[in-house]
Amino acid sequence: MKFVIIGGVAGGMSAATRLRRLQEDAEIVVFEKGPNVSFANCGLPYYLSGEIDEREKLLIQTPESLAARFRLDVRVDHEVTAIFPETKEVEVSHGGESRKETYDALLLSPGAKPFIPEITGLSEAKNVFTVRNVPDVDAIMEKLEEQPRKAVVIGAGFIGIEVAENLKKRGLDVTIVERTPQVVPTLDEEMASFIQKELENNDVQVLTNCAVTSFEEQGNMLRLENGEMLESDLTILSVGVQPDSRLAEMAGLTLGLRGGIVVDEHYQTSDPAIFAVGDAIVVKHQITKKPALISLASPANRQGRQAADNMAGRPRLNQGSLGTAIVRAFGQTAASTGITERQAKKAGLSFQVLHASGKDHAGYYPSATDLLLKLIFHPETGEIYGAQGIGQKGVDKRIDILATAIKGHLTVFDLPELELTYAPPFGSAKDPVNMLGYIAMNVIEGLSEMIQWHELPEELAHGKQLLDVRNKEELQKGYFPKASHIPLSELRQRLDELDKEQEYIVSCHSGLRSYLAERILKQAGFTVKNLDGAFSLYQAVRPDELCYPQG
């Protein structure tokens, strides 16, 4: 049996090594058009600042090491230029010469390529780079030797955020230009606002709702759509990726969403002898059940292994992807799994949203830091659709737990039952994940009714009254205009100051005390809802709509 794999790195090399473990006598040939068949592409931004201090650490395996350990025939700098499904051959170019190679089964793992927008003057710019492979960062490092002062990062997705952070740590003045209203478009607006604030607190200029319309002076000046000019010694394009499906298209394979390669649940393409994995394929999103493009290393590695099993006659099913991802911006971490509130609306799902604040470990233990979690779930069944987290520490742990819960088809009713490790340095007796479950149960069972931060202005305009139950000292940090104020500790004694004909919205700092106030008021006969996320969340998203004491 002869297996040919086009493309290395995550998907291709996972498949190649798995095939060898399954079939010792098989012939396995890997063609990689670049010079590196196995490298840490997710680590590339951190090499720019020196956080990863040696280039060699980015190179995971070499053709020689793979030949020695797995008896793989790995050929770098070999570009497959055509596939001939009818004869089961591929055409390979190397060193100016072309030849054909036969196969019994073929795996496509071409990955994705950076999306290059059509911008006037881009082709003449001499200082514009992408970050996709080792030669890309080699070119950027060479440019950094010229001691550039100003850098512009176009695009505020994960790669853009990581590159901006590392260029800033390198000592450059960094500006991020993002055409959408927020950074990290894969997060919901209020969660992304924490990352934008962290970038700005570290002197990274962030321009949202803004696009570059032209490069001038060979890329040293960028014109924005509002007419302003940005000076740039170094520009990074990170406006997303698109499937590198050119070979598949030339071979007549079926393509789908945005040119992604269509595969079945066994990773077979429209040609049964050709399989495909990684960033180039269309997957089924586990929540929406709709086609999706998910360019992440973890799914690509898993897909490579599963495709190898199928190619070797050991059936494995692709169960879909959640798109679980994480990014660091200086001292803050953001992570997500499943779908966002925005995606739930677009998919037409019935859903409920809640936010829960906590600490990464027991609050009384030293160095506890704030943690904010968001949950999207079905308002009746409690099915978990997605989750997001923001904080300095512990975000990865909580989102990993919630991603596992979704994969295991747990509901919000199961979250309080999770027995998670606890000691004061590591967590809390009621972990924030447990608390998400408790809060969601209260909502589903009718003990609590919530409104979201973006609904507050309209609710107030319709006559509802906001009641702030924080302490007087907390008001010195900011307060809602026209809100009533009764500290929670005084609420029971001051119920006669409230009007049972008036509908109330209660708020505190993060949501716990306002829930307690909600329960007190409801049982006293008042109509009341709880502002989800409370003052702290609203302040993060719309600080200009709040009042602050003078001085």
State each model region's role.
Residues 1, 8, 12, 280-393, ...:
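Mid-to-C-terminal Rossmann-like scaffold of FAD/NAD(P)H-dependent oxidoreductases
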Residues 1-73, 158, 164-187, 324, ...:
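Beta1-alpha1 glycine-rich phosphate/pyrophosphate-binding loop at the start
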Residues 18-105, 188-205, 341-343, 435, ...:
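N-terminal Rossmann-like dinucleotide/flavin-binding domain of flavoprotein oxidoreductases
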Residues 25-27, 69, 75-94, 101, ...:
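A Rossmann-like FAD-binding core segment of flavoenzymes
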Residues 59, 150-151, 158-214, 296-300, ...:
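Rossmann-like dinucleotide-binding cores of NAD(P)H-dependent redox enzymes
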Residues 110-170, 205-206, 263-265, 486-488, ...:
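Glycine-rich dinucleotide-binding loop and its adjacent helix/turn
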Residues 124-147, 219-223, 228-306, 401, ...:
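FAD-site-proximal beta/loop scaffold in flavoenzymes
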Residues 413-424, 428-465, 472-503, 512-551:
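Rhodanese-like catalytic fold shared by cysteine-dependent sulfurtransferases
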